[in-house]
């Protein structure tokens, strides 16, 4: 038999079946279908393990199926549905139009209660659908779906309850109660019969779906089938498809309204096709004028205008009113204008914790990931899959980031990662390698990169947030990427030639250390499907292939490049081991306080690419993570000083909401992510935020609000948000005693031509106010002594470095717009009593050579009055603060729990969170972590400010200048003086013994910032250089 003839036979057979079924339905008499069978309460037997499940897991949002599939889970297992007809609305009739009765039905299923409105004709249509289904089930159609249905209903009674046959027109008002009772009984009986309760016509009649009864999605809202119009998205750049009003199509979708968002699904596949978040621009409008559609309903938010089409104007009004009423009742916080213009509300009694440096931050992230049950969200400016989150490495690869993520993905956790897609000519962070490495670990790991530079026309700005979110309940927020070079502790070690292995009594662990490194390297090679058997793991600087893309050689600087001079004189011989035991041949001057016990052996803290000096040489060959690219015996690493935080509950929900908004926007914007393999994400309800499965130890309750910098290009929102900028200015203006700032950049003081953020102006005005009122007021500012280019620009040129220096100095002390330029006309030299500018530096010894290096301050921290803290990813510059440029995330924490303290010599109630963080920072930079002899309680007193802070910074800077002749230096005002300065002998080389004696006087890391370095030179890029071509906004 040919294929064509076989097709004709099959078609003919199906037509006969359809005809027989039609005849069967026509002959049915509903009067004979009274309910006589035994009622069935539940669709699971007592032995069924699902009978014990009283909830649907949140992870089921990723496994939705077509609405007509027979085995989908819509209802809570073992939980009945109760129906009650509450009221009947009767619309007045005319001689031509009969009366219409509208029944309000309240349904209860477990913790969920909702209402539907139905006319009697809807009951009749529903009844006919069930009759068709009952007849259809009898026909033995040989399909998998149909066979499954027949097997499931074989043991069930076939009888159905009867529906009242009398017309609605004949019902008098006094008979409404009887009619209500009849319909109520009808629904109750239908819902006790699994055969009919699980049928798709029943779920549609009840307005329920697979997402209706998920606990973490909050209360059940309005649902139903609608027609929606395509387009309406706000996509910036060149992608304008769907924006025109004439180019659209209508599609049938299932709409679901939740407390903080609404979504629609495709009925055929069950796929979530769009998610619209409730925000302060959320509006609902009805009518042809607003929608250009008959019976139209328009829903607006910051990201989209969604047009729906209803059956009638009355239906559209009811939908609009019901949605608005539900959102006002359950999600009113999202509709309000919040403090500082933030998208997020202020939350009381939220658990929060701070971190100084990445050691504790990474460890808590690793522990939280290990507890993840449903989702892990990560977004970073840079992410290195092979970094270790717990160090020293004493458990093999267990705590390596990629291994953690793979392990959790295998356990069923969904992992979503967003990476900044860099301009490859400008940055060498190789996000493509990170994405490729992570994606092939497991199908449950999804990675997106954004932006696409051509289609979005975004070349200058970056996604700069650093977030890790666990189950939308625990959120890590700060300035620390999960990337190479970030891990550090309070020691700020300069070198790591082989240091860490825990020694227990009588047991050497050399073999364990060797096995650890061997397994780590072998796993990496195996995971990446490549072999490097003939390649050495340790490479010197000169061993790296200079032809490789992304800077294969040490950076080249101009003739008088600052770093060139610095490295030529000091760094080529510099390295140290600050964690080796005193019995080792080469020791550090610093005491060994590792926090991990007494350490011996050859295992390292920083493996391969993690050992870095990004000023001396950029990262190369990131696809070889455990191959050194810097000779750690001649070049010290740059220590990394940073701040992070962790939040719980509603605050964590807000962080997740920002991530979800960005993820869903990227999915819509980039065609490659529109497939079902990249799902839309849904925010969990604030109503369940207090149910914490896991809590990070050491967190304290406080008042918390999330802040961000976001715009159309980064988050797809109509109006940009600069709540971080607003919060900084507000906190500074309202501070009463002091502010403490740590930041990677300090570019401010608006002239409304080149620089626009007003953080520096707020500082200057607050100091002037204190002076006029005769108040004692202090400002502490800690920034890197030299720019490191780690974040935004990595060209490696001296011109770029000097351009950043220009804007830093322009903010601090050079020009009339600078802070000192605003203070000196009124204060003269008295400004020194109010404000201090410092950096951080450390030193070590290796191979008999004394070496020094700056500590790179990457923090984004503001503390005020020991009661308010802002921690985040935002630098003090226009890129981070203005909202329209880099995307950022921060949190403002205000203490509600206090401890007795001293402020300005008087008793004071200091916040637990803020004071604890301030004291940790002070003890670290001043060298009092292990020495409680000095009282640091009062940050305002003259004794502390002058005799401890200023004195320590000046003494340390003087000693470093004397021993190493460090750059930058106040003796160097121009390039001629620079030549002379670098030609003079260095004490560290000429007389190491005397130099070592001087270095013993160093306390902590704090050093004064040099104001007059190259003050007679124009540090802006010269005309004709490539840096001069770059728009000025890149530097600011």
Swiss-Prot record:
Cellular component aspect of the GO annotation: endoplasmic reticulum membrane; Golgi membrane; late endosome membrane; perinuclear region of cytoplasm
Phosphoserine: modified positions = 499, 561, 591
Covalent lipidation (S-palmitoyl cysteine), chain numbering: 240-241
Q: How does it sit in the membrane?
A: Lipid-anchor
According to the UniProt record, where is the region Catalytic? Answer: 463-890
Description of how the protein assembles with itself and partners: Interacts with PIP5K1B.
The name this protein carries in UniProt is Phospholipase D1
List the source organism: Cricetulus griseus
The uppermost taxa in this organism's lineage are: Eukaryota, Metazoa, Chordata, Craniata, Vertebrata
